[in-house]
Amino acid sequence: MILLNSILVAFDFSDTSISALNYGRNLAHAFGGRLHVLNIADVISTSAAQFYPEGPGDPEAKATALALSQLKTILAAENAPEARPAVRVAPDPAVAIVDFAKEIHADLIVIGTHGRTGVSRILMGSVAEHVVRTAPCPVLVVRPAEHERSEEHTSELQSQR
């Protein structure tokens, strides 16, 4: 029998991660598991936190607090108030996701993929692919809707001209 006591959703505020959240929420509900939702704040983007109107302070702490607040808002809007939100600052999202999965003893990781191909995949890499290769548990990869993939593919072709 499959037990999903602890489910981790990797969340990057994209439409695909909303879909991943819905999968994770439904699985947690069906299996009676605990739902964890993790956002990895980019180290570079935390430097922009120094410009927040709250004044001076630790930019990393401000960026983390802002991401956590936004994450809680989305969880409430997506009918996942029981989810346990978390934000980590890390230079490598894939490593941070796998480390967090180990920390919470995740039975499943749910992650969206942006479906990049070609040059953009080579340049940006694939967080989902790295998580699949290194995760301590099974990984459910949620693909973007067909229209999202076709829009991204079109913009990629246009950028190659």
Question: What residue spans do the PLM features occupy?
Answer:
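Single conserved hydrophobic/aromatic residue that forms the stacking wall/gate
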Residues: E152-R161
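Short, hinge-like loop/turn segments at secondary-structure boundaries
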Residues: Y52-P56, A101-I104, V127-A128, S155
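General small-molecule cofactor/ligand-binding pocket signal
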Residues: H36-L38, R84-R88, L140
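Glycine-rich, Arg-bearing micro-motifs that act as flexible, cationic patches
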Residues: L108-H130, P144, E148-R149
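A short acidic, glycine-rich active-site loop
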Residues: G55-S69
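Small/aliphatic-rich secondary-structure junction motif
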Residues: I2-E54, A61, H147, S155
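Structural beta-alpha unit
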Residues: M1-I2, L75-I109, H147-R149
